Amino acid sequence: MNNSSELIAVINGFRNSGRFCDISIVINDERINAHKLILSGASEYFSILFSNNFIDSNEYEVNLSHLDYQSVNDLIDYIYGIPLSLTNDNVKYILSTADFLQIGSAITECENYILKNLCSKNCIDFYIYADKYNNKKIESASFNTILQNILRLINDENFKYLTEESMIKILSDDMLNIKNEDFAPLILIKWLESTQQSCTVELLRCLRISLLSPQVIKSLYSHQLVSSIYECITFLNNIAFLDESFPRYHSIELISIGISNSHDKISINCYNHKKNTWEMISSRRYRCSFAVAVLDNIIYMMGGYDQSPYRSSKVIAYNTCTNSWIYDIPELKYPRSNCGGLADDEYIYCIGGIRDQDSSLTSSIDKWKPSKPYWQKYAKMREPKCDMGVAMLNGLIYVMGGIVKGDTCTDALESLSEDGWMKHQRLPIKMSNMSTIVHDGKIYISGGYNNSSVVNVISNLVLSYNPIYDEWTKLSSLNIPRINPALWSAHNKLYVGGGISDDVRTNTSETYDKEKDCWTLDNGHVLPRNYIMYKCEPIKHKYPLEKTQYTNDFLKYLESFIGS
């Protein structure tokens, strides 16, 4: 004999003919003859059973009537070299039996089959099975499949078999695949209706209440399975006192704006949460040193340089809802670069920068309202500057740091309101080219240049400004110093990515741990190589239903948007 497969085939022939068989597995009225030695070699259960005096050495029968005959027969065939023939119908029975008999290779084969064939049609069934038999590998995979396909599953016949504990787990998960929080109450109501179970406060707590539309909150109030429970109505009556909720991962899109390494084009990238990668969704011809602002899910890019040596006054935009570029936007009042960009609920602002005529710094702030035919003057900064940090907080425009006359950095912090400019606590160090973000009621800045004289030192500093106490706090430094990085806030976390470090484009990203006050390199948000990220914006998905009047069948109307 040349190999073990030939040997096992011979031994299986002995079994089929009854030669040397010394054990018979009895299941109800069925018998399976086998060899103790072969079973013990493949099954930990049989190994212990036959070697530790659990049965008399002369005993010829083992009764396993509590197991499924066909599954035991298939597994003993498997031990004797016959491949398992797995299907969606039999794999659960075979896996449960293999787990009881402790046949490791069969367990692995069954698990791999389930993982390979998991889909929206069977994920609930496999999740319930895995939860019952405590199979964490399948439970985790099937649960993630449920999260990914939840809006398909609310009309699945197996949806009603999910327990309240499972629904709490599903509705609480950040990765629930809904693009608008209004769909979470729809999922809850569909489950309540399918089970005819009354709502509980524990289920309502899973919803991100502060993100729900008034129409959906009214729908919860009026639904009989909710309104009939006093505790639920009491909870809904007090939602004004709940903490602000953070969006789920799929309810926003992370959109980055930068310069790609492909002929240095402007590149619009979108973060794929499922693959943990950035994917380019659009690009256009080269431009750099432009300002970025986002209003109504449209990304505006103002000024900068194009392929000519001159600064530009052009404004272009990318509509994230239609995935299209917009070119018919009024030009800036004059060409400029290295300016700041901001937006409030109505206007786009272009702040400071370098003018084209003589490369002089400008202090002007211009604003434009979409649909208007021109930009208008809004205000002037106290001194001309470029490459400063800008932020919009509590209706005020904050301008911090930047490069001023003499190519030096400044540490000034000022805010602009209808009453004019107000000075605030200066930065701890003179800075420029840093990134800024408003998060949790504070202004955060990171990276850039810091130097009191010549602008040449790349910074890894991270600072936060509290407008209530008018004070700066120094946080843990970045692992990698960088200028012009992107700083963004998503899901109650801070991220920084891209920029230039030691004159080289860096594709690294870092995540801030507030409790530990430390930054860690983030492998999940690594950028495309040689990609300069100018800005990263969380874009909230919008739906036509947001402007729809409430009706008694609003949830049915909401359901019609699934898949759109």
Curated annotation (Swiss-Prot):
Record note on domains: The BTB domain is responsible for the interaction with CUL3 while the Kelch repeat domains supposely serve to recruit the cellular substrates.
Chief localization: host cell
Alphabetized GO MF terms: ubiquitin-like ligase-substrate adaptor activity
InterPro entries named among the record's database cross-references: BACK (IPR011705), BTB/POZ_dom (IPR000210), Kelch-typ_b-propeller (IPR015915), Kelch_1 (IPR006652), SKP1/BTB/POZ_sf (IPR011333), Vaccinia_A55R (IPR024182)
BTB domain residues: 21-88
Protein's recorded name: Kelch repeat and BTB domain-containing protein A55
Gene3D superfamilies: 1.25.40.420, Kelch-type beta propeller, Potassium Channel Kv1.1, Chain A
